[in-house]
Amino acid sequence: MNLVITISRRFGTGASLIAQELSEKLGVPVYDKAYIEHELDDDSYATEAEVIKGLAEHPCIILGRCASEILKDQPNVFNVYVCADKEDRIERIMKKESLSHDEAKEMLEKNDAERAAYYYENTGKVWGDVNNYHLAIDDSEVGIDGAVKLILEYLNHL
């Protein structure tokens, strides 16, 4: 089966780590913003969507970039949304970026607002609406390993 997993997430969650661990367990590549933007001839959403559709011709994990919406009509696409407690996200950002609590909180709020605007602008939908995903995971509750186990367990039932 040509399984494609899309992972949408709030800024500061462990979604990148979840994607990497899934990649190792499933033996498929992860494509993120940096990879996708590197493949673009221009920065239009339509071009980005074409790149994502091309990547989805083979088993892979796509992190962000409205991939769940871009691939919504394709078979064998499994959409995951990762969220986490705001304070947990701030703590992760503080550690990763060496920021104060206030700086990390500001970065989180700015990034979340930008992601919400980008998603709405390009899809007409509300970012983070769990109705757009097969599975929503709070990694504050289950951790990175728990999230990976949940996703793998869900996939075993498909």
Model-assigned labels for residue ranges:
Residues 41-42, 100-145:
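Small-molecule kinase domains that catalyze NTP-dependent phosphoryl transfer to phosphate-bearing small molecules
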Residues 34-59:
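ATP-dependent small-molecule kinase phosphotransfer cores
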Residues 7-22:
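Glycine-rich phosphate-binding P-loop
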Residues 54-97:
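ATP-dependent NMP and nucleoside kinases share a basic, alpha-helical "lid"
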Residues 1-5, 58:
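Pre-Walker A (Motif I) flank of P-loop NTPase domains
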Residues 25-31:
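Post-Walker A helix-loop "phosphate-sensing" segment adjacent to the P-loop in P-loop NTPases
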Residues 45, 49, 144-152:
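Short, amphipathic alpha-helical "lid/cap" segments that border enzyme active or binding sites
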